[in-house]
Amino acid sequence: QKNNTRYSAMKICTITCQNADNYGARLQCFALAYWLKKEGNEVEVIDYQPDYMREPNLWYIPSSVKELVKLFVRFPERLCSVKRHKIYSEFSKKYIPLTKVYNNINELRNDPPIADIYLAGSDQIWNPTFRNGTDPAYYLDFGPENVQRKSFSASFAVSSIENIQKKLWIKNNLKRFDKITVREQSALKILKEMGYDGELQDDPVFMLSAEEWNRALNLEESWKKLGIKNEKYVLIYDFFLSDEIKSVALEYGKQNNCKIFSVCHKSLSYADKNFVYADPVDFVNLIKHACCVISNSFHGTCFAMIYNVSYVIV
């Protein structure tokens, strides 16, 4: 892909799914803000936290005996989710320049952040299978009309939008954009079907070199805290806990005489070490030092490429 987008000496507010609890969401958000600031801009990330993307509640009032049983059965899992959310949030507070919290589109419309440019992206902000895909906030439906509105490496995360009603809604809401850049060729096709011209734009994580990532996240110091010493390992980052990744990992570990480390949201029984509570900095470090990354994650693959680590996409 290519990068045709240049920004300098502007006040820019970006909006993305920065509150999602996964490594890619937080790291691409950080990378875009970091790069824009490096280009000489004043940058803030809109801290948009709609109800569907909020911190998981540890407790809630069950409406039936069935719900009560479900609450207790899933309590350990919910506890893990709350702990992970705290870890992700601490990363964002330390590394990402956030605005005040906005809980819904009305709050954004009533008190929009001041900026020269509103920038939507990156990541799956327009994914029509998720609620954010038809949330007006991610289509910049707020703020003064004279503010420039652009997207940066936005993704629909699908090859086509089959739901006609959603497709029409998205088409109408893209009208307010002055420029649209997207992450995938498939997104260009979707835009063309809607009558829009778009450009390909690399994901923000590629805007930083490996050396810049090392410095920006202080990786050398953080690596020491993980306590991994001279261990050869293949790293598993598996969104779906798939049997296919398991078989590939076991075979790779056997053939290459290396351990299996996991950085998934749940422990894997076949892994030698599980880093369930790794923060985004640990995630980058674990990829950087791996002999191979086996994943079904876009950003897992991206960081393997950045650090020139072998990878297998499953």
Please annotate each region the language model reported.
Residues 177-184, 294:
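A short beta-strand/loop micro-motif in the catalytic core of glycosyltransferases
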Residues 1-9:
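Short, Lys/Arg-enriched N-terminal segments with co-localized hydrophobic residues
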Residues 115, 177, 290:
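An anion/phosphate-binding loop that grips the pyrophosphate of nucleotide cofactors and donors
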Residues 35, 190, 252, 286, ...:
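Hydrophobic/aromatic ligand-binding patch that stacks against planar heteroaromatic rings
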